[in-house]
Amino acid sequence: MSNALPKGVFDIFPYVTSPKNLWRNSSLWKRVEHAAHRICNLYGFDEIRTPVFEKTETFLRVGEHSDIVKKEVYTFLDKKGRSLTLRPEGTAAVVRALLDHSADMRKDNKFYYILPMFRYERQQSGRYRQHHQFGLEAIGVRHPLRDAEVLSLLWDFYAAVGLQHMQIHVNFLGGQKTRARYDEALREFFRKDLDRLSPLSQERYHANLLRILDSKEPEDQEFIEKAPSILDYIDDRDLSYFDAVLAQLKALGIPFAINPRLVRGLDYYTDLVFEAVTVVGERSYALGGGGRYDELVAQSGGPSMPAFGFGVGLERVIQTLLEQGNSLSTSTRRLRLIPMDEQADAFCFSWANRLRNLGIATEVDWSHKKPKLSLKDAADQQVSFVCLLGEQELATKQFIVKDMSLHQSFSGAQQDVEQRLVYEVQNA
């Protein structure tokens, strides 16, 4: 019987050290997730957690013709024949949760989440059937400064984790009237060459016209480049809104580029849409994206409420950090006590608890190996500090702590050592 995982999923494991799989090390994930929590807290966003599965109808609202709904959802019937779906994206679930808690709804609702998503993706680099998304939803306010604020938050997150060569690509899809005018122009443009488009784009021509612009098929690129720009169809009010957002990005020093071909893969987006991309030479790929979805709450049975949000795939963020040579440590600042005999065992057990109460992450090596082997294990496992305790240390009450990264030591009485460790941990 094979214990191998199904395709498209993976373990986030604490002891991974091989370069190929280092991105799966749980210490890296904790650091990136901590940055997301910290930045969202600074901007006044609160965490939300929705169920792993919901009624299928919740996710149909993202668009019956979107790739997610048509091809990628994990849907099943429960024992009573009810259709349920594993969460493929966060926005629809958050909107559903907000409406379910309507008594607690505010005029300005600010949520973020770090949750697994499930999609039946084609097997390729950077895509997984269970992936993890850092997402944010701001529901209730329509203002160009809100859009700029959310983009600023996202930019601060990328800076906090150490991503480089980032740029925001933006477009403006407009509301229903703008989209109707643009759809008419786009349909007329593609009609004369419809049989030369890829099969997928021919299908989208009849079901979801705008998504042709998102095609990666080689035979479509010539036509996409020549297609009308939606920016020629937005009215003065939309243009003023778009310009106001761009002015704030410029003031914040956030590099951006206008991409009139940019659309999103879900049908609920309106007005401003964006992708955050990393650009290295001629190669670029998205590390997140989102935009405004002012009609989704009403389409979900709620009041008319404007909204703006984004989603960031954490797998790709962590992989990119490592590709860019970011020196992410897979270890935490931790002390390992190594008792050399049974008498030291009891002291180490007691002292470890005292150190933890002081805020010092402390573990005890109970193996009673030879000191040389215990020190080698500590070095291999990237332990920050090591303290060997035997008969002499207990008799003199003088302890030596080795700093494994600096290859230096400091020593002193118990209280002095504790104060030094607290300082080292707080100033790491």
Curated annotation (Swiss-Prot):
The keyword Ligase applies. Coiled coil: none annotated. One of its GO terms (biological process) is histidyl-tRNA aminoacylation. Its EC number is 6.1.1.21. It comes from the Bacteria. The keyword Zinc-finger does not apply. It catalyses: tRNA(His) + L-histidine + ATP = L-histidyl-tRNA(His) + AMP + diphosphate + H(+). GO terms for molecular function: ATP binding; histidine-tRNA ligase activity. GO terms for cellular component: cytoplasm. Keywords: Aminoacyl-tRNA synthetase, ATP-binding, Cytoplasm, Ligase, Nucleotide-binding, Protein biosynthesis. It is found in: Cytoplasm. Its main location: cytoplasm. Homodimer. Belongs to the class-II aminoacyl-tRNA synthetase family. This is Histidine--tRNA ligase. It comes from Chlamydia trachomatis serovar L2 (strain ATCC VR-902B / DSM 19102 / 434/Bu).
